């Protein structure tokens, strides 16, 4: 297991003087306090770091590989069996052990793929909805060129023969729904498939008593989380529960489930060690004294460990958690707490990038600046180990753009200015910080990102532009009322209404929702397009960061209100083990 010198990773403690008694009237966001006491976090323990659990997992990995190899023995259902194996190991979060087996299985399926899809086996003479839908989704997610025309009839219209509600048919429609969520722009048949399958599945849950516990749980989960609010460790945690509800498990299911539970709990022991470091960094750096900001260091580490679930990616998880936490502190300084004079000084200090730049800053900003400075520098050193080049200037340019966007929004707040929708979004997709949150962490991964590949992921690529726009728009939908109550008038909603006199808030929200849906399809294309110069594996973590952030906006602004669904996410994926 690769390790990082944790004593060096953004860990320098800076004593902050945070008493602000200068007579200046300051706004605050009135956020709830930190939910995770450092003493509680330091007391966490688990037995799953013991070697015996790793040894048992390794034996099971070998047995599952043998299961992959035996799939092709039956010509009547080998395609469906292979796809089901791929689907299961991916959803259980154990696919990293079977990359060669997954590629071999998908190459085999693709060799039998036709314009009408596939049957259950290589000798099947009739195509099968479940096999075709599962195959379409898996092949598209792995970059194979497959057309959605497989779901059309001879007249070019969406066609589905599902008219009963047997368990087999429901599973086929479920996988059709899952396939429809990875639609590309212009695929109307996939829109029709999504509409049909969603209605069918919701009705099935209400009316069909024969639906097994595992299938009903699977349907409920997919309808709830879909594609963009789902991400690896969250899906693994929930799918383990669903898998465990199978009333007639076979030996294959039992082995997969045992391995998934072991891997989940073994990784949990690593999560605990890293979480303790993040919490101690937060406490020792003096952030616990900040009363005006959102303390979400534990939540950001949770997201990081739900995205990067390979043990060797420790630098990604720790760096992402700390950079995102610092980003949210600085966002609160610019949006509410800081005065315009202070913000101008801080922005200038960032561009100087020198500890001596703190001399002109107010006391409460000095410590924040120094911790931020050390963290960005150390992340650049970590990136140099994997990329073989100095990326600090790249990171600095990224953050300078964010602070310029922060400052522009602060000016709007101060003056009450509401820009045009285009002006707002152009600035807002930078100020959201997606690019800054993504760039340095992905550079620490063991995936080479030469400049020509990085340019396809980072700004100003279409991929980055779409991801940042989606997050800014979704964030506004969830948070514009709270921001307006704090005197922050500019949002995509208010800007749309300004551009379109007579438009209501409902009109604006409907239009923005439509924009988000279209941008998601475009992003699917940028992420999954076949024959790209950039492998999907190089874009995956950047895409999963988008999904993690988008997840926090599923019900409300989960960055600001973290004591509901966000707290549940922390408990289920970070603090609790899976029972055997």
Swiss-Prot record:
<feature type="binding site">
    <location>
        <position position="331"/>
    </location>
    <ligand>
        <name>Mg(2+) 2</name>
    </ligand>
</feature>
<dbReference type="InterPro" id="IPR036965">
    <property type="entry name" value="Terpene_synth_N_sf"/>
</dbReference>
<dbReference type="Pfam" id="PF03936">
    <property type="entry name" value="Terpene_synth_C"/>
</dbReference>
<dbReference type="InterPro" id="IPR001906">
    <property type="entry name" value="Terpene_synth_N"/>
</dbReference>
<feature type="binding site">
    <location>
        <position position="335"/>
    </location>
    <ligand>
        <name>Mg(2+) 2</name>
    </ligand>
</feature>
<comment type="function">
    <text>Terpene synthase (TPS) involved in the biosynthesis of sesquiterpene and monoterpene natural products included in conifer oleoresin secretions and volatile emissions; these compounds contribute to biotic and abiotic stress defense against herbivores and pathogens. Catalyzes the conversion of (2E,6E)-farnesyl diphosphate (FPP) to (3E,6E)-alpha-farnesene and of (2E)-geranyl diphosphate (GPP) to (E)-beta-ocimene.</text>
</comment>
<dbReference type="InterPro" id="IPR005630">
    <property type="entry name" value="Terpene_synthase_metal-bd"/>
</dbReference>
<keyword id="KW-0460">Magnesium</keyword>
<dbReference type="InterPro" id="IPR008949">
    <property type="entry name" value="Isoprenoid_synthase_dom_sf"/>
</dbReference>
<dbReference type="GO" id="GO:0016099">
    <property type="term" value="P:monoterpenoid biosynthetic process"/>
</dbReference>
<dbReference type="GO" id="GO:0016102">
    <property type="term" value="P:diterpenoid biosynthetic process"/>
</dbReference>
<feature type="short sequence motif" description="DDXXD motif">
    <location>
        <begin position="331"/>
        <end position="335"/>
    </location>
</feature>
<comment type="pathway">
    <text>Sesquiterpene biosynthesis.</text>
</comment>
<dbReference type="InterPro" id="IPR034741">
    <property type="entry name" value="Terpene_cyclase-like_1_C"/>
</dbReference>
<dbReference type="GO" id="GO:0016829">
    <property type="term" value="F:lyase activity"/>
</dbReference>
<dbReference type="GO" id="GO:0010597">
    <property type="term" value="P:green leaf volatile biosynthetic process"/>
</dbReference>
<dbReference type="InterPro" id="IPR044814">
    <property type="entry name" value="Terpene_cyclase_plant_C1"/>
</dbReference>
<feature type="binding site">
    <location>
        <position position="483"/>
    </location>
    <ligand>
        <name>Mg(2+) 3</name>
    </ligand>
</feature>
<dbReference type="InterPro" id="IPR008930">
    <property type="entry name" value="Terpenoid_cyclase/PrenylTrfase"/>
</dbReference>
<dbReference type="GO" id="GO:0000287">
    <property type="term" value="F:magnesium ion binding"/>
</dbReference>
<dbReference type="GO" id="GO:0052578">
    <property type="term" value="F:alpha-farnesene synthase activity"/>
</dbReference>
<dbReference type="Pfam" id="PF01397">
    <property type="entry name" value="Terpene_synth"/>
</dbReference>
<dbReference type="GO" id="GO:0016106">
    <property type="term" value="P:sesquiterpenoid biosynthetic process"/>
</dbReference>
<feature type="binding site">
    <location>
        <position position="335"/>
    </location>
    <ligand>
        <name>Mg(2+) 1</name>
    </ligand>
</feature>
<comment type="similarity">
    <text>Belongs to the terpene synthase family. Tpsd subfamily.</text>
</comment>
<dbReference type="GO" id="GO:0034768">
    <property type="term" value="F:(E)-beta-ocimene synthase activity"/>
</dbReference>
<keyword id="KW-0479">Metal-binding</keyword>
<comment type="pathway">
    <text>Terpene metabolism; oleoresin biosynthesis.</text>
</comment>
<feature type="binding site">
    <location>
        <position position="331"/>
    </location>
    <ligand>
        <name>Mg(2+) 1</name>
    </ligand>
</feature>
<protein>
    <recommendedName>
        <fullName>(E,E)-alpha-farnesene synthase</fullName>
        <ecNumber>4.2.3.46</ecNumber>
        <ecNumber>4.2.3.106</ecNumber>
    </recommendedName>
</protein>
<dbReference type="InterPro" id="IPR050148">
    <property type="entry name" value="Terpene_synthase-like"/>
</dbReference>
<keyword id="KW-0456">Lyase</keyword>
């Amino acid at each position: 297991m690769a390790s990082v010198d944790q004593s060096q990773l953004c860990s320098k403690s800076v004593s902050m003087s945070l008493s602000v008694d200068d007579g200046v009237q300051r706004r605050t966001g009135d956020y709830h306090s930190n939910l995770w006491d450092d003493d509680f976090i330091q007391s966490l323990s688990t037995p799953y770091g013991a070697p015996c659990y790793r040894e048992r997992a390794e034996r099971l990995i070998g047995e599952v590989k043998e299961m992959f190899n035996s799939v092709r023995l039956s010509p009547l259902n080998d395609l469906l069996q292979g796809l089901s194996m791929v689907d299961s190991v991916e959803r259980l979060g154990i696919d990293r052990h079977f990359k060669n087996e997954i590629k071999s299985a998908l190459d085999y399926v693709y060799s039998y793929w036709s314009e009408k899809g596939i049957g259950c086996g290589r000798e099947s003479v009739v195509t099968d909805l479940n096999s075709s839908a599962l195959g379409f989704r898996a092949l598209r997610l792995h970059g194979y060129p497959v057309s959605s025309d497989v779901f059309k009839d001879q007249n070019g219209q969406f066609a589905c023969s599902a008219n009963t509600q047997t368990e087999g048919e429901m599973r086929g429609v479920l996988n059709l729904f899952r396939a429809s969520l990875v639609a590309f722009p212009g695929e109307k048949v996939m829109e029709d498939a999504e509409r049909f399958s969603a209605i069918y599945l919701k009705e099935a849950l209400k009316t069909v008593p024969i639906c097994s516990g595992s299938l009903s749980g699977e349907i409920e989960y997919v309808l709830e989380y879909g594609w963009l609010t789902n991400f690896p460790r969250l899906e693994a945690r929930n799918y383990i529960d669903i898998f465990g509800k199978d009333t007639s498990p076979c030996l294959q299911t039992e082995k997969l489930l045992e391995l998934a539970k072991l891997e989940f709990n073994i990784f949990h022991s690593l999560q605990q060690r890293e979480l303790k470091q993040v919490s101690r960094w937060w406490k020792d750096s003096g952030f616990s004294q900040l009363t005006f900001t959102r303390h979400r260091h534990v939540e950001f580490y949770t997201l990081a460990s739900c995205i990067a679930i390979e043990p060797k990616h420790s630098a990604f998880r720790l760096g992402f958690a700390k950079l995102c936490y610092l980003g949210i502190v600085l966002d609160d300084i610019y949006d509410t707490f800081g005065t315009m004079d202070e913000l101008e000084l801080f922005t200038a200090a960032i561009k100087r990038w020198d500890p001596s730049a703190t001399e002109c800053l107010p006391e409460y900003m000095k410590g924040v600046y120094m911790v931020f400075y050390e963290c960005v520098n150390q992340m650049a050193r970590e990136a140099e180990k994997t990329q073989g080049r100095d990326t600090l200037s790249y990171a600095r340019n990224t953050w300078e753009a964010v602070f310029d966007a922060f400052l522009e929004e602060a000016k709007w707040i101060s003056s009450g200015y509401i820009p045009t929708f285009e002006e707002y979004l152009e600035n807002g997709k930078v100020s959201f910080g997606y690019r800054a949150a993504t760039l340095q962490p992905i550079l620490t991964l063991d995936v080479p990102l030469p400049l020509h590949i990085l340019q396809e992921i980072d700004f100003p690529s279409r991929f980055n532009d779409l991801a940042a726009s989606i997050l800014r728009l979704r964030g506004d939908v969830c948070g514009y009322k709270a921001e307006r109550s704090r005197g922050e008038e500019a949002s995509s909603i208010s800007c749309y209404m300004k551009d379109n006199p007579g438009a209501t808030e409902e009109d604006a929200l409907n239009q923005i929702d439509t924009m988000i849906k279209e941008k998601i399809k475009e992003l699917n294309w940028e992420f999954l397009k076949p024959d790209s110069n950039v492998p999907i594996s190089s874009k995956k973590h950047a895409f999963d960061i988008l999904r993690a952030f988008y997840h926090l906006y599923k019900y409300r602004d989960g960055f600001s209100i973290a004591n509901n669904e966000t707290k549940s996410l922390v408990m289920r994926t970070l603090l609790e083990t899976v029972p055997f």
